[in-house]
């Protein structure tokens, strides 16, 4: 065997301590990150020696070459890994945790585990409780000395347990205890033990430059003190001899804060807030040292007036006195741990207000427990009011879902892992005993488990919303829809897998119900026998929808049309495509079928106006893709519709409003506009005569241009040049009203006066019907 190689890892301050001839004990200061045991060989070739020097344990690593082994590939020597302990601790402390403040969560969790262990063991050994007092945790910050002291009345530790638990990196005493509990099903059936990785204690060095642990186990008569400083590979253990520091039972941890962290973490209010955030639902009372004020009654001497004799009179008054005392920080109990049948509605509302700092009662709640691959308890709430900021609708990081593991807060910073973005308005708590977390307990590890949880949470949320929609009190769902309807519409776009759950919850105004919202189920129930589709129209307002020319024939035939008046509505409906085998049809697009067409009449109309359609298309050129006879108009002369795959007027308006709108796409999509004409309208009949009898007429051409421009506006589009359109209208108005009510041109009037015509003041009134002569060229 090769000679042993030795390397001392204890820090330089130890060299100044005189070495006393005390026995040196061999202890394996192991790390779960290093291979040891049967993986290499039974004999230990890399041992950690704890040399006791003046009660200080210094870490030494003796790395030895293993015996030569012969394998199929040939002979070779097997080595074991070595580690720089101070560097390893630095990596554990500063690389695992993203926030310094989690040190308090970890230490409180350790204290809770110690109390749980004592409670379990006392079932069979009641003597362990002794006179150690109530099971509790106390946290006392000291801003003057820059320290935080955390005391629990739990199981404590013996000297051997101190070395084993605090001297062994990644050695979890809780994990060992849980393993023992599993062997005893009666004791281990129900526990609240939290720790599992064996590194949480070292998070104290996130904020502390020195940590002192004083502990007293009911199994031992002696109390021991463990001390260590940051960036050191050694620690000290001594027996406590000062009677003022003797504990009846439990553990006291004192953190000597770093200079940069004293002002933040030695402040009492900060500590209280951290406890409320991370450890509010720990199963044992947590008291924090807080400054309080009280009003006391005192006696004061009344001032003696001049000339008066005798002793001054006493008068009673009050003053405010400040003092320090213990305050319970976790008074709110974990409501989700109780049976839902035993909890009153008022308790749910009160818990909601305290947990989420709300002032309104929630609109609804659901309390459930799931079992199977993942077991967890949860309470979900629908708030009484929606977000005031529209950005919250599209922001998945709303911190509304709080994840707990064994009632210890883990995180509320989820980027859509637990809840989809469109359900981000839901608030609630999720608590599990067996979630796969990373070592820092800040991130969920296993995506499969997360997917299962997400699926169940979504299903329960939809069940809760469905109950509101089916409630006898219709105002509840009306309130829900006003506040959160936009979120569900977003779900139509983002979650195709849940369309069947989302679609029945949608509500819209319609041509038959402009005051109350209607559901798609009600729409289908009211459909006629020949109606095969769900018709909708997207506009910018309810007023615009009601006056749109697209509706004319549908209203005449008593066909209901849904009004989509919010920007997200049209995209949401387009993503749904169908509901209960009924297609969604936009009535502002080409090829509209109403289900009761008269094919003979339609064919005759197309034949009669086929020449006019070609003539108008020739006049308009590339402005429209084609011109055709309409089956959707009854009172308007024409309407401009979009191509089947093009943007509607509403969508075009929204895309133009985008800050980074794609102009090339806009030009491509708008090129499929189609002008539809009403064959029964007088203007169209006149133009039909004009195209046959006077196709070169400039007046007819001007009418076509103006007809197209007005169709742009009435159909919801935006004209390219409003000023040019205005001039055309003014010109046509001048033609229509010029001289009609007695006005004459100034030149005409002046020439008449010069000629002395005494009839110049008389004006002949001509009726419009008399203007058209029998030989009008536009007549057939």
UniProtKB/Swiss-Prot annotation:
> CDD domains in the record, alphabetically?
HATPase_Hsp90-like
* Biological-process GO terms, alphabetical: de-etiolation; protein import into chloroplast stroma; response to chlorate; response to heat; response to salt stress; response to water deprivation
Transit sequence range: 1-60
Q: Which residues bind ATP?
A: 106, 110, 152, 157, 172-173, 196-201, 251, 441
Please indicate which superkingdom the organism of origin belongs to: Eukaryota
List where in the cell it is found.
Plastid, Chloroplast stroma
Q: Does the keyword Transmembrane helix apply?
A: no
Query: What is the protein's given name?
Result: Heat shock protein 90-5, chloroplastic
Annotated source species: Arabidopsis thaliana
